[in-house]
Amino acid sequence: MARDVLTDLTKVRNIGIMAHIDAGKTTTTERILYYTGITYKIGEVHDGAATMDWMEEEQKRGITITSAATTTFWGDNQINIIDTPGHVDFTVEVERSLRVLDGAVAVFDGKEGVEPQSEQVWRQADKYEVPRICFVNKMDKLGADFYYTVRTIEERLAAKPLVLQLPIGSESDFQGVVDLVRMKALTWRGEVKKGEDYAVEDIPAELADEAAKYREQLVEAVAETDEALMEAYFGGEELTEEQIKNGIRKLTINREAFPVLCGTAFKNKGVQPMLDAVVDYLPSPLDVPPVQGLLPDGETAAERKPSTQEPFAALVSKISVHPFFGKLTYVRVYSGKVSSGTQVINSTKERKERIGKMFQMHSNKENPVDEIQAGHIYAVIGLKDTTTGDTLCDPQNPIVLESMTFPAPVIEVAIEPKTKADQEKLSTAIQKLAEEDPTFQVKLDDETGQTIIKGMGELHLEVLVNRMKSDFKVEANIGKPQVAYRETIRKTVEKYEYTHKKQTGGSGQFARVIISLEPIEQSADSATYEFENKVTGGRVPREYIPSVDQGAQDAMQYGVLAGYPLVGIKVTLLDGQYHEVDSSEMAFKIAGSIAMKEAAAKASPALLEPIMAVEVTTPEDYMGDVIGDLNSRRGHIQAMEERSGVRVVKAQVPLSEMFGYVGDLRSKTQGRANYSMVFDSYAEVPANVAKEIIAKATGE
């Protein structure tokens, strides 16, 4: 039976489960749902039966693709959980879930320690200042090493681990944990009723010294949070359990340290103490600073406190298509409350919206609620023009909350429907999937008439194409993956003048613009473009300025070298001229567009390609072959290190050189090496390679 949403926000936790692919996130979430009483049968990822992996694609692959949201209770506390994907191609899901969370559980593989994707997700959580606790999972795995994993958290993430538990036994002999706060042993003997019952015992004699050492470090870290505690500690007083817990909570919420616990979710050991830690140490909506935003003027800062007494404000974190309700919009409510049927304003797009039915979600099942209120995550239906990152708020007290930034797609494929009937279904499928996923983009190739879909990697596009088949019944042919190149400029062009004039009977067209172009720094997660207006004395009327901006942006879509989108450019409108009768928005848009294109051709244009951060794990014997192969792919070796008896090579390699790498690596190392790859940045293509790419793109 669904319980009501808690209004006492001190007892609410909005958390995410984040990790590298295969570290055991979904299994951990499943166990949480089981122990908190929502699922009555434990779902296993291996069987394709996990509750949170509700899309057919996820169940088939055993990985999480979209961040399912679920609400559950632990004791008298409410935990809203988002299970995020760990595969690099689905960064957008991680990004948008972290934006609306207050805290997270970072799950690590007890044998592998910090892996490349865990590092990337950790950095994303740093960006949104999310407090975390760490759960070292898979302690029953052959080669699991708790202390090694703690070391990698410190070294690779430059984070301060705060060890709260030590493992009792390891690998197949892993029996439980030493709780350093209570100084007791918690043991799970055998497979007792799915691990629900655990014994609280004295610490085994052989672990007493180790436990005392780590307890000392813990108490010292806690004492440093408060002068009174520091005096008591150095005065030889024992700190109480409550004082220690309060100190850990303070360190965690301030992100000065990250509590580390351990267990094995698959074998049902260590999950309940981890849930206790979520409640004890992660922040409630009241512990995080008020959410920041801007008033509609776009300049005045404003904030909303997490209270139902404040005006309503919510951020849209995700859109998904539901088989019965159609468009489901997930929102994190930061302040105020609204009931069904209320009119709100989408302040990002300045559109009115009416909220229809509202639900508290459990994976893909829904519990209807009468009102949505501050501090919680819900799904609502009935919103027409709202997309991910938009703000919904009280029409009388508008605010625009900080949105999310999503990386530009790096790979594209052509897609062709097999029949005329598929053509219509394909358009619907593409529109719905693009609504759900901001990193999935579509364009029509003007020359070939083909539909091109773009995404974050081969797996990302493969999953989307398979969803078109399963969810929308579209049959389509898919082309070979292509790299999403970009173009940029290398030098500044001052005062470039263009006049657009047309006289064909009746009123003509007239617009003169003088612009400058300059290269600007590009960030990994946005295709940068800036526009500045420096026109004085009304030489270009104010109502035409946005048209020049729009024209320049239109021209950015097709670069001058090979027709790839332009990035990293600042356009400044310096001066211009207009005609009382013949000038129009359209005339200035055309002038802005052509001026931009012609000026870019004079600004030393260059071709850019996506560079991937590649990490290869290989036995020592194949090290030479692996490095030689990466060098032959125009790779730059960044670092080499030893990790758990194998060698790790880190390199930066152009994406265009990485197609088919998985097969080549397998054959070179007899299948003993593996690799991971994440998008790093865009970089200039060497001249000899660029020449070939441009010739191919322009058909020369």
Swiss-Prot record:
Residues 10-286 form the tr-type G domain. SUPFAM superfamilies: EF-G C-terminal domain-like (SSF54980), P-loop containing nucleoside triphosphate hydrolases (SSF52540), Ribosomal protein S5 domain 2-like (SSF54211), Translation proteins (SSF50447). GO terms for cellular component: cytoplasm. PROSITE patterns: G_TR_1, G_TR_2. GO terms for molecular function: GTP binding; GTPase activity; translation elongation factor activity. It comes from the Bacteria. Pfam families: EFG_C (PF00679), EFG_III (PF14492), EFG_IV (PF03764), GTP_EFTU (PF00009), GTP_EFTU_D2 (PF03144). It is found in: Cytoplasm. Keywords: Cytoplasm, Elongation factor, GTP-binding, Nucleotide-binding, Protein biosynthesis. Its main location: cytoplasm. GTP binds at residues 19-26, 83-87, 137-140. GO terms for biological process: ribosome disassembly. Catalyzes the GTP-dependent ribosomal translocation step during translation elongation. During this step, the ribosome changes from the pre-translocational (PRE) to the post-translocational (POST) state as the newly formed A-site-bound peptidyl-tRNA and P-site-bound deacylated tRNA move to the P and E sites, respectively. Catalyzes the coordinated movement of the two tRNA molecules, the mRNA and conformational changes in the ribosome. Belongs to the TRAFAC class translation factor GTPase superfamily. Classic translation factor GTPase family. EF-G/EF-2 subfamily. PANTHER family: RIBOSOME-RELEASING FACTOR 2, MITOCHONDRIAL, TRANSLATION ELONGATION FACTOR G-RELATED. This is Elongation factor G. It comes from Saccharopolyspora erythraea (strain ATCC 11635 / DSM 40517 / JCM 4748 / NBRC 13426 / NCIMB 8594 / NRRL 2338).
